[in-house]
């Protein structure tokens, strides 16, 4: 007999919705648990089977914590701004808002069909003006605190499309759409000063319960380096340039300098004879992405400016070159080259026949650069010193001479925040007719995104909003001056930087969230999502959160106390699921054929939650068979409760497996080891099928432990057991440590180390009692008759070995 998943799931989903079963409780005196999923971008493709893996994990924890008496916050929403909707709108002429709403409705239906215990009254959508009012408000605060500024930044400009492209839209120097040439062009952009928080973003990682691999990725992205800034004068010019180096001790080995093609001094210092060559090189460089420019495998290119820098430590003339492997966005946009001890500088020097001067003993620099340690040579005052001594001495000298200073730098760049797009949050800035700019007053927020059919690029590099004159041109309500609205919009990251705060108080129109509620719910106890957000989303969120902490909006320094990355569900052929490969599994199909509980159970039983595992239809069938077996254990052929389930004090047959199951399942759910927790539920079911009598309390508690994984079946069985209330708030079972110990244990009796007999004895038997039992055993007595006992070895709980001759 099998249960009808379609009927059961529909019945309980309606019950939960009508009764608002999962409305967040905020009872005083209860502990809190905030379980958060990385909310999805509602794409046109709908949910795939990878989404429910993480969602089921947080749902199991949320359901268990409710039963353990916690106030649980378990919300869901939509990260709904972004490029795909705008692209769709451009291609079809449809409104991205309508497209997005349609996709959200699909996602919501699919997620509800999986029985997740979300509080749908807290649903948020980043494209809702009630939500993005507060995204804009945070921007105004960043601006007021000097953390949002306008800068000239090199962007990917596509003349044919008349728009700026994101890095991921450029492939091999051409636009992904249409294959048009793309070039690098400096444009005024909004930038957020995340670098002001670099040190704290780095240091506070140590306090977080996150996978070490993710913390390491963030550390590398922030990229802290200690070294010195050194100033180089330019022969025949008043100007100078600064380089940052982690190895100021190698300054004596510098033989040339390199500027990025975009460096502001290039035009000034290039000599007339080199002008044509330099201009041709600059034109070539602007067609390449940063990634292409810094590729170590590519051949080094460059051009000489004809100008010379002066080495501050020895007065030597260093030719100044331009090369595209130096980026203006990284460091100071200029480097001192020490080819004897740096592989990239060495290759460049060999290509252009530049001098190579060894200043650290070791290696063979006629063959390759020597990057190892050694004594300093050819280095004047540093000769004979090791690396640490020489770095320290050189920095002291530079500071004393006014030629440089000790410096800590970060690989982390300030965050390029503006997008030349329509489908994003408008940036709340007014450009006044007197040339000044200011934030829009809070009373005027939100600045609504205007509805328009015209979302094609402006052609000027501004966003399509620049085309809407009646929206752009306005009056500043405070000064009465004419003003132009900022036409750039925010990136998709903006809305996801703080959404977890809005879930705490989603309908507040007076503040981002009530401070008392933020105090009650933060930090997030568990955050589960894919590792693809390891760096940017998590780093940006931490940055905004720290800023909000500094201005007194949030009570914690960090948003996410514990983070867990679920693995990827691959296609049956072990390849990543994708439409093009035709191996995508649609959850709607599985819910129809096998049921939502089966899908949840299977995804949790596939293997460790953080492993990437191939989808298996056999495994799915196995999960369904187990749930049918559970149903038959509780429900007879007549549809009534199994007669073996009774109120009884005779629990001997099931007692130990019951306490073992409660202990293991509780600990495994807490530790996100759902696959081994399910294995223990299977052990319980196997024992239950063998038992003559099934104590009702044990069976009820089994249903409680099953229900976080298979909630629809859990509710159905709970009702069959005679309950009129949902199982969702039934008290989570507890175990007795004393009942986990086996009363009896099987031991082996050996003669001269060979197994001869097995014996059941009391588990607390002493060595002496074990020896006595062995000697009195009939079979053993027969086998040792007439022999001399040399010694008897007893190992409690395991064996007795009688040595005879």
From Swiss-Prot:
CDD domains: Anticodon_Ia_Leu_BEm, LeuRS_core. InterPro entries: aa-tRNA-synth_I_CS, aa-tRNA-synth_Ia, Leu-tRNA-ligase, Leu_tRNA-synth_edit, M/V/L/I-tRNA-synth_anticd-bd, Methionyl/Leucyl_tRNA_Synth, Rossmann-like_a/b/a_fold, tRNAsynth_Ia_anticodon-bd. A motif ('KMSKS' region) lies at residues 576-580. ATP binds at residue 579. It catalyses: tRNA(Leu) + L-leucine + ATP = L-leucyl-tRNA(Leu) + AMP + diphosphate. Transmembrane segments: none annotated. Belongs to the class-I aminoacyl-tRNA synthetase family. This is Leucine--tRNA ligase. It comes from Brevibacillus brevis (strain 47 / JCM 6285 / NBRC 100599).
């Amino acid at each position: 007999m099998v249960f009808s998943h379609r009927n059961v799931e529909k019945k309980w989903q309606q019950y939960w919705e009508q009764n608002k079963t999962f409305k967040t409780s905020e009872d005083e005196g209860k502990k809190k648990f905030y379980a958060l999923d990385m909310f999805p971008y509602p794409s046109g493709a709908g949910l795939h089977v990878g989404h429910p893996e993480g969602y089921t994990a947080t749902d199991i924890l949320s359901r268990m914590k409710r039963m353990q008496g916690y106030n649980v916050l378990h919300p869901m929403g939509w990260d709904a701004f972004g490029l795909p909707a705008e692209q769709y709108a451009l291609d079809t002429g449809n409104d991205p808002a309508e497209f997005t709403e349609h996709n959200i409705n699909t996602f919501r239906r699919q997620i509800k069909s999986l029985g997740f215990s979300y509080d749908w009254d807290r649903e948020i959508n980043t494209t809702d003006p009630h939500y993005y009012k507060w995204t804009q408000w945070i921007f105004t605060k960043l601006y007021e605190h000097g953390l949002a500024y306008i800068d000239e930044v090199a962007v990917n400009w596509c003349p044919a499309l008349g728009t700026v492209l994101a890095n991921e839209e450029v492939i091999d120097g051409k636009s992904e759409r249409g294959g048009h040439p793309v070039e690098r062009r400096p444009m005024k952009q909004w930038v957020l000063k995340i670098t002001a928080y670099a040190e704290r973003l780095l240091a506070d990682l140590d306090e977080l319960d996150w996978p070490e691999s993710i913390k390491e990725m963030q550390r590398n992205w922030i990229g802290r380096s200690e070294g010195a800034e050194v100033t180089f004068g330019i022969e025949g010019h008043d100007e100078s340039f600064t380089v940052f180096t982690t190895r100021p001790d190698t300054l004596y080995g510098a033989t040339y300098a390199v500027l990025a093609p975009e460096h502001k001094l290039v035009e000034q210092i290039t000599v007339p004879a080199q002008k044509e060559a330099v201009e041709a090189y600059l034109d070539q460089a602007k067609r390449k992405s940063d990634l292409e420019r810094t590729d170590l495998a590519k051949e080094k290119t460059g051009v000489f400016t004809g100008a010379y820098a002066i080495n501050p430590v020895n007065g030597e003339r260093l030719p100044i070159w331009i090369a595209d492997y130096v980026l203006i966005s990284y460091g100071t946009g200029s480097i001192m080259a020490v080819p004897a001890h740096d592989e990239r500088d060495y290759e460049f020097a060999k290509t252009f026949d530049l001098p190579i001067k060894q200043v650290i003993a070791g290696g063979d620099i006629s063959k390759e650069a020597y990057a190892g340690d050694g004594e300093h040579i050819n280095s004047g005052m540093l000769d004979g010193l090791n690396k640490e001594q020489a770095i320290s001495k050189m920095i002291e000298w530079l500071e004393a001479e006014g030629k440089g200073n000790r410096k800590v730098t970060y690989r982390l760049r300030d965050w390029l925040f503006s997008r030349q797009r329509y489908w994003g949050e408008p940036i709340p800035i007014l450009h006044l007719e007197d040339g000044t700019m200011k934030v829009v007053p809070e009373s005027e927020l939100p600045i609504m995104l205007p509805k328009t059919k015209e979302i094609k690029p402006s052609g000027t590099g501004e966003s399509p909003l620049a085309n809407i004159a009646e929206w752009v041109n306005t009056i500043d309500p405070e000064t009465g001056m004419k003003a132009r609205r900022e036409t750039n919009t925010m990136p998709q990251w903006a809305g996801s930087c703080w959404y977890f705060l809005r879930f705490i108080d989603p309908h507040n129109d007076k503040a981002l969230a009530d401070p008392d509620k933020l105090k009650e719910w933060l930090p997030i106890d568990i955050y589960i999502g894919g590792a693809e957000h390891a760096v940017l989303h998590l780093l940006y969120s931490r940055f905004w959160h720290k800023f909000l902490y500094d201005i007194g909006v949030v009570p914690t320094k960090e948003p996410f106390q514990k983070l867990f990355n679920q693995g990827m569900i691959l296609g049956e052929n072990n390849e990543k699921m994708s439409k093009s490969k035709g191996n995508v599994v649609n959850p709607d199909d599985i819910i129809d054929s096998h049921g939502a509980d089966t899908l949840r159970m299977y995804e949790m039983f596939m293997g460790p939650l953080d492993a990437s595992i191939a989808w298996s239809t056999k495994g799915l069938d196995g999960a369904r068979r187990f749930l049918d077996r559970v149903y038959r254990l509780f429900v007879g052929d007549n549809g009534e409760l199994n007669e073996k389930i009774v109120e009884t004090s005779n629990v001997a047959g099931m007692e130990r497996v019951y306490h073992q199951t409660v202990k293991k399942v509780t600990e495994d759910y807490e530790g996100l080891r759902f696959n081994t927790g399910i294995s223990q539920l299977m052990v319980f079911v196997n024992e239950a099928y063998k038992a003559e009598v099934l104590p009702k309390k044990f069976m009820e508690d089994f249903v409680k432990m099953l229900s976080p994984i298979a909630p629809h079946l859990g509710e159905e069985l709970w009702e069959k057991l005679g309950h009129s209330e949902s199982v969702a708030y039934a008290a989570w079972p507890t175990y007795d440590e004393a009942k986990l110990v086996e009363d009896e244990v099987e031991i082996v009796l050996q003669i001269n180390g060979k197994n001869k007999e097995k014996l059941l004895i009391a588990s607390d038997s002493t060595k002496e009692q074990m020896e006595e039992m062995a000697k009195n055993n009939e079979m053993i007595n027969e086998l040792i008759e007439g022999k001399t006992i040399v010694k008897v070895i007893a190992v409690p709980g395991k064996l007795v070995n009688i040595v005879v001759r």
